[in-house]
Each structure stands twice: as structure tokens, then as C-alpha cells.
Regions:
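ADP-ribose/adenylate-binding Rossmann-like module
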Residues: 67-74, 85-103
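Short acidic low-complexity segments
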Residues: 51-62
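Glycine-rich adenosine-cofactor-binding loop
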Residues: 6-21
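A conserved regulatory-domain signal marking ACT and ACT-like small-molecule sensing domains
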Residues: 306, 312-400
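NAD(P)-binding Rossmann-fold cofactor-contacting core
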Residues: 26-46
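Rossmann-fold NAD(P)-binding glycine/threonine-rich loop
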Residues: 79-84, 97-134
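Substrate-binding/catalytic subdomain of NAD(P)-dependent oxidoreductase enzymes
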Residues: 172-268, 273-275
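Conserved anion/nucleotide-ligand pocket segment
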Residues: 136-202
Length: 400
């Protein structure tokens, strides 16, 4: 008789409930959730209260669990849960991209030290199995670039604005009502969610463990309908794109809005869908598309990770280990980043003073009116870091 695996689950929010639903209807995976640890004692939940606990030790202290599944919001608490589980010899499935991106080096070493697996497909591309593909299908491929739409909330907002002539605030509210965006949407709209996911994909694409502070992230929080209109007139759609591509022996890695042309596969990826383009020396370009937000799509990715652990699946990290061998062990992956280049951008601004800090090399086009001002210009890429995480800036910057 096939053994049923026992799960300990942290978190029963959007993704946790999605996992519960898809697991309940799964005909292949034999698994039982033993306990679910949550914070709010007063919140109404759709399953029997006997499954819930408010003490993390009720899960971390159990000896009979096969897998711990971490699906909570806060990265600090998630890190404690994941590291304790691995140090106890228990494999972990997580969808917490912020926790992973901020602590990847230590988490990588803990997997090796304790001979356990940390699986996180649901943290990077929603329902798209992009990490598994990078680990297996592309493990020996010489990749030149990976780029994609990694945030379903932002793509939903941008699609609503363009196709339905909706303003940003209304589109954001609808994304929140649909459960695609959080009540505090900053991490989504400011590009940080995309940044964290990009860091994970860069590990599996090129073997680089980057830190969030080393990578540029600009978001859509300042977008206006004027920007959408300008893009449409030029035959583009605005998309928040994560990019990592190799240039010589270095890598350009960043996340920011882009004008995307009709020739790109990503042009037709709409609403809460994600899309990822992978380009290699031999496989050429391939595009993956799937749901990037929502309870059940991410829950299904988590379920797939749990299933993989039943046959002792682990990430091999071939490219990471190979790169480290080439550099005789540990090294700062930031030294392989190229930030010294020019990038062509569209910048909408209220006044010239707002452009202070951006090193403009040349201006190709300029428009001024009482309603809006914008320029198309080549700028020093490195200078755009002055805008990262700046809640006071009203500039909208988009790669052309």
C-alpha cells in the first residue's frame, strides 16, 4: 500500500486555501495536512477548527511530518520556519519569494548541509513550471537571456488600463478585489515582487546568487493614462518586464516597465497571466505562458512541488555549482553584473527638477504641455538606481 505523506502547513491565506482545494481534489498525490498554523484566532475558515493551531511548535516539534509547507506573508518568520525545518532534517516547500531572495546563500548551504530539499516553484512564475524547466530541460543549455512578466497583479492592472480605458487607481482596486494584489500593493506595483522572482530565475538560468539591493527594480505605481496612450499610438503595450541577459562575460539584470512591440510573444500575455521567454544558443527562443496570480494556480504549483518530494526530487543547481568551480568557491556574484551601460527610456515628469539624479546622455524626443511632459532619452543605467524604492518620486520611467 502506498504511503500517505504527512504535511505541516504554515499559512491559510490565498495560496494556502488554494493548496487545500487542489489537494482535496487530487487523484494522484496521497497526502494529508496534519496541522495548519495561522495567526488570527477569530478569522472564519471553511474547514474544521481541529486542523488549526496558533503555535508554530505544534508543527516544528512534530517528528512524524514528511514535508513542511510554508505559505505565510512575512519573510522573517518564514525564514525561521524554513531554516528550523531543514535543520531538523525535513524538506520544505515554500512560495515566499522575498524570503528566498533575501537569504538565498544561506538557504542553499542549509540544503547541502542537511541533505534536504527546498522546493519553490510557486514562488517564481505562478502556475508556470519555469524553475523545473530551467533545472532540467535547460540544465546543459548555454542560455543567453531570460525575460518575462512575473507579476500577475501588474499585468492585470496594465491590461485593464489599456483595453478598458480604466485609470490606474480603479484598475488597482479591481486587482485587489480579485485577490491578485494585496491591500498594501507596494511590493507588487513598485517592482519588488518581480525583482525577487527575477533573482530566483537568475540563480537557475546563470548560476548567480544576487542580492535584492544589487538589482534595479522600477515599477508602475506612477503610471498614468497618458503613458498608456503614448504607447498605443506607437504600437506598443507597456509591460513590467524582468530581464537577465548575458553580455560578454557579464550579466545585465533588472526589472522595469518596457514598451513591448507586437512582434514579442509577451505582447499578447494579458490580465493576470505571466509569460517567460527563455533564449539559448541551441534551443533558440521559447515562451511559457500561464496564470500568474490567484489562489488555485499558485496552489497547484505548490502541490506539484510536494508531489516532486515524494520521489526525492531536489534542485541540482548545476549552473550555480559550475560557476563557483570556475571561481574557486564562493564569490560575490555582484562582480559579474554590468551596470555601466546606456539604456533608452521614456520618462514622463512634472518638471525638469524631477529629473535630477538621472544622468541623461542624449535626448531623442521631447514633448511639453500644460498637461504632461515627457522625453525619450538615452541615460546612464546606473543612475536609475536613484529611483528604486523612492515613494516620493512621481516620475514614470519605461524602457523603449
Amino acid at each position: 500500500m502506498e504511503k500517505r505523506i504527512k504535511l505541516g502547513l504554515f499559512g491559510f491565506g490565498c495560496v494556502g486555501q488554494g493548496l487545500y482545494d487542489v489537494l482535496s481534489h487530487s487523484e494522484g498525490l496521497k497526502a494529508d495536512i496534519e496541522k495548519i498554523c495561522v495567526k488570527d484566532r477569530n478569522k472564519k475558515r471553511k474547514i474544521d477548527a481541529k486542523y488549526f493551531t496558533y503555535d508554530k511548535e505544534d508543527i516544528l516539534g512534530r517528528k512524524n511530518l514528511d514535508v513542511i509547507v510554508e505559505l505565510i506573508d512575512t519573510s522573517e518568520a518564514a525564514f525561521e520556519i524554513v531554516t528550523r525545518a531543514m535543520n531538523n532534517g525535513v524538506s520544505v516547500v515554500t512560495a515566499n519569494k522575498k524570503m528566498l531572495a533575501e537569504n538565498f546563500e544561506e538557504l542553499f548551504h542549509l540544503q547541502e548541509k542537511n541533505n534536504v530539499a527546498l522546493i519553490y516553484e510557486g514562488s517564481a512564475g505562478g502556475s508556470i513550471p519555469i524553475i523545473r524547466n530551467l533545472e532540467e530541460y535547460y540544465d546543459n543549455e548555454l542560455l543567453s537571456s531570460i525575460r518575462g512578466l512575473l507579476n500577475g497583479s501588474c499585468n492585470y492592472i496594465l491590461t485593464r488600463m489599456e483595453l478598458e480605458n480604466m485609470d490606474y487607481n480603479k484598475a488597482l482596486k479591481m486587482a485587489q478585489e480579485q485577490g491578485f494584489a494585496e491591500s498594501d500593493p507596494w511590493l507588487d506595483v513598485a517592482g519588488y515582487d518581480t525583482l525577487y522572482k527575477l533573482i530566483l530565475l537568475t540563480v537557475h538560468s546563470f548560476g548567480l546568487i544576487l542580492k535584492p539591493e544589487q538589482v534595479l527594480a522600477l515599477g508602475i505605481q506612477n503610471i498614468s493614462f497618458d503613458d498608456i496612450t503614448y504607447a498605443k499610438e506607437k504600437g506598443y503595450r507597456i509591460k513590467l518586464i524582468a530581464t537577465a541577459h548575458k553580455v560578454g562575460n557579464k550579466f545585465r539584470v533588472y526589472a522595469m516597465p518596457h514598451f513591448v512591440s507586437k512582434e514579442s510573444d509577451l505582447y499578447s500575455v494579458l490580465y493576470e497571466n505571466n509569460g517567460v521567454e527563455v533564449e539559448g544558443a541551441y534551443s533558440c527562443k521559447q515562451t511559457f505562458v500561464g496564470k500568474g496570480a490567484g489562489s488555485h494556480p499558485t496552489g497547484s504549483a505548490v502541490l506539484s512541488d510536494i508531489s516532486a518530494l515524494t520521489y526525492q526530487y531536489k534542485y541540482a543547481y548545476k549552473k550555480l555549482k559550475k560557476l563557483r568551480e570556475q571561481h574557486n568557491g564562493n564569490f560575490d556574484a555582484g562582480t559579474l553584473l554590468d551596470t555601466d551601460f546606456e539604456i533608452k527610456v521614456y520618462i514622463r515628469f512634472a518638471n525638469k527638477e524631477a529629473l535630477k539624479g538621472i544622468e541623461i546622455v542624449s535626448v531623442e524626443e521631447e514633448f511639453k504641455s500644460s498637461k504632461t511632459n515627457y522625453i525619450i532619452a538615452s541615460v546612464k543605467f546606473k543612475s536609475l538606481f536613484s529611483l528604486k524604492g523612492n515613494r516620493d518620486s512621481k516620475l514614470f520611467v519605461c524602457a523603449v
